Amino acid sequence: MRIISGKNRGRQITAPSSLPVRPTTDMSKESLFNILNNYFYFDRVVVLDLFAGTGNLTYEFASRGALSVTSVDNHQGCADFIRRTAGKLGYSQVSVIKADAFVFTKHCKQQFDIIFADPPYELADIEKIIDNVFEHNLLKPDGWLVMEHSKAHDFSQHPQFYQHRKYGKVNFTFLVNMTDNSDSSEEEEEDQEDGR
């Protein structure tokens, strides 16, 4: 995986092959951050990275100067790898929590500007993550929840739905903590996938 922008732009990170992960592709990650860049100043955001895996998104947010990034994964190997890598890269704003994302989002008391969730595509009931985020008020006003998912899921009828983007086999649904979603849109972008 590669850090696309920020102080560690171009840095390649190789995760152990033993980790049970499916990292977000560089192409889809770059497209995602191009969208976020239009709405957020990264040096002002507080981020939660759920199902963090190798920490791919965690490092990208940290490289771009995020105020803090909380990285949550239930796999000990993943949590240890993120902690080591963040330390090597000097990301003091990164905190790593080994926890089940469903349980964590039920009990977390902090609010975030951006929450990114990349559950395993085959995982059942991933909509519970969305429910937990909004029921437990984990987003700041105008904060965003970004769900990465397969085409099997459609969250366009959720009251906080904002937009949907597709890059190859990667789907992103954006949900926003706001009361007026009149500008919600469904956008499809078909691109070649470059691997995760």
Indicate residue ranges for each PLM-predicted region.
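Class I S-adenosyl-L-methionine-dependent methyltransferase catalytic core
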Residues: M1-R196
